[in-house]
């Protein structure tokens, strides 16, 4: 059975940064509606919206306090209904980002859990430990321990894999699994066409009594990823969730974020016999070249080039292993990493080459907003703009190694995910047409390229992407076989074939 998403070309919209319609400096749903003609001209047939639910915005919407309402900064439910209707009218499907591993600490479930020791919602989260002793030495992805003291002063702690204001849900509890399923079906009933399942690989945790073994005697928390990523229970709990959705909405796309999943796990997650997801987004494509890293200070935010040899190996493995199972996702950047024009491409020609290389392979393209204009990361002027303790630590480390504050700050601007979320440049008007007010995120450099100029220039990056997308829609590039040819390290050549058709895609890097 064919589904619409078998031919999907997805455009990722970071709503806060796409288009502001009311002058508050924050992009919103009505701003997105205004730009539907632009999306149609580009040629995409689906959009993925980063979270637009009610949120305190601790983590830019990934901390949800109400799944059944639109954040007032984004608009209203009526705006959302109109957006869905107008997108569909333009032949564009709508995919929503669904945060299902955790909620905001302001969510009514968590608030009740910490105010009432007998609350049924206490078991919606993971509380453990006693006598003010943490259960284990596991570390959070956002730094520090995964354990935060229970505000109710019970002597226990609650589990948070990300920010302490984003407590993890207890997926062992069938009531939690049912509640999340009901939320998903609510939005699908409203007319959306699919869900990106955020951080689903983390919903299962190992035995909380188990410390992660380390060589050091230090008591610093350690990111014990094997204990909370891709555990077998993930599939056990996600299967009924996915089956229920597919039973009621058989044409809904379920796109899982499986950041650390290897290709064999991707097969498990997307094999149709397993009744799970249709495709997954992995972060395993991009192996960085560590050879130029300065060993005298932290490597975390030092710019690193792409290891092209390992990239080719990774692509060949993912293409061949998933062949006949599911379509891989094809992308160069998203909201969790620096932009391709900053991170990898050395110039405009290389950016185009990389786009062609990636998107004409077998799979589902996901184009990050502004990528089609050659957008780069913003350059921040102050460390406080990052709101990230790891950045402060990196800059101090770099300064001790002889770097100036500005040199270190520039490194972080080129590698951190936040500067990749800058406002979309639409034209040459105030704030590049993004907003009449002060944009929520600014840097000292703004891209010279803007959508209006790019559309008017037949040789622009935008028009290159438009032609590339049109080419991708041909059956040969949608459904054809794939074979990566052996070539030198600085070239990337593959063949696509379908019946009597054949194409050779050759890129010099």
In which residue ranges do the predicted regions lie?
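Active-site-adjacent bridging/hinge elements
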Residues: 155-159, 326-344
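Hydrophobic residues within beta-strands of alpha/beta enzymes
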Residues: 47, 195-197
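Acidic/aromatic-lined carbohydrate-recognition and catalytic surfaces
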Residues: 2-185, 189, 202-263, 272, ...
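Flexible loop/turn segments at secondary-structure boundaries
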Residues: 55-56, 102-104, 145, 196, ...
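Residue-level marker for buried hydrophobic side chains located in beta-strands
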Residues: 94, 195, 368-369, 505
């Amino acid at each position: 059975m064919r589904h619409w998403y078998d031919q999907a070309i997805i455009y990722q919209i970071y709503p806060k940064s796409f288009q502001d319609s009311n002058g508050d400096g924050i992009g919103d749903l009505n701003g997105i509606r205004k730009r539907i003609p632009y999306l149609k001209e580009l040629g995409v047939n689906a959009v993925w919206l980063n979270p637009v639910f009610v949120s305190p915005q601790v983590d830019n919407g990934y901390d949800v306090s109400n799944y059944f309402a639109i954040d007032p900064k984004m608009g209203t439910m009526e705006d959302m209904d109109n957006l869905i209707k107008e997108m569909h009218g333009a032949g564009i499907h709508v995919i929503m980002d669904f945060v299902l591993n955790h909620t905001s600490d302001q969510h009514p479930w968590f608030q009740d859990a910490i105010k009432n020791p007998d609350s049924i919602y206490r078991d919606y989260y993971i509380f453990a430990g006693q006598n003010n002793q943490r259960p284990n030495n596991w570390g959070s992805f956002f730094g520090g321990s995964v354990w935060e003291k229970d505000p109710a002063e019970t002597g226990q702690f609650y589990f948070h894999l990300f920010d302490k204001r984003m407590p993890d849900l207890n997926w062992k509890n069938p009531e939690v699994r049912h509640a999340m399923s009901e939320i998903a079906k609510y939005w699908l009933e409203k007319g959306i066409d699919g869900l990106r399942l955020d951080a689903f690989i983390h919903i299962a945790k190992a035995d909380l009594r188990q410390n992660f073994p380390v060589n050091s005697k230090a008591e610093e928390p350690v990111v014990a990823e094997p204990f909370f990523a891709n555990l077998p229970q993930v599939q056990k709990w996600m299967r009924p969730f996915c089956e229920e959705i597919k039973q009621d909405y058989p044409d809904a796309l379920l796109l899982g974020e499986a950041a650390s999943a290897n290709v064999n796990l991707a097969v498990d997650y997307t094999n149709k016999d397993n009744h799970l997801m249709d495709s997954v987004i992995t972060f395993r494509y991009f192996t960085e070249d560590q050879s130029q890293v300065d060993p005298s200070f932290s490597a975390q935010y030092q710019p690193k080039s792409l290891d092209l040899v390992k990239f080719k190996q990774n692509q060949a493995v993912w293409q061949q292993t998933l062949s006949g199972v599911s379509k891989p996702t094809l992308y160069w950047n998203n909201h969790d990493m620096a932009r391709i024009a900053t991170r990898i491409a050395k110039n405009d020609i290389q950016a185009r080459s990389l786009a062609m290389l990636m998107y004409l392979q077998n799979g589902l393209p996901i184009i990050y907003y502004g990528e089609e204009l050659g957008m780069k990361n913003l350059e921040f002027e102050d460390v406080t703009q990052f709101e990230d303790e790891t950045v402060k630590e990196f800059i101090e480390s770099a300064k001790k190694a002889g770097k100036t504050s500005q040199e270190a700050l520039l490194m972080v601007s080129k590698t951190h995910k936040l500067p990749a979320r800058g406002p979309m440049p639409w034209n040459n008007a105030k704030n590049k047409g993004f907003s009449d007010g002060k944009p929520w995120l600014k840097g000292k450099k703004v891209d010279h390229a803007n959508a209006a100029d790019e559309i008017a220039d037949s040789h622009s990056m935008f028009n290159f992407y438009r032609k590339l997308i049109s080419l991708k829609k041909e059956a040969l590039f949608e459904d054809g076989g794939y074979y990566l040819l052996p070539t030198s390290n600085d070239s990337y050549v593959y063949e696509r074939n379908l019946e009597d058709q054949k194409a050779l895609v050759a890129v010099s890097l």
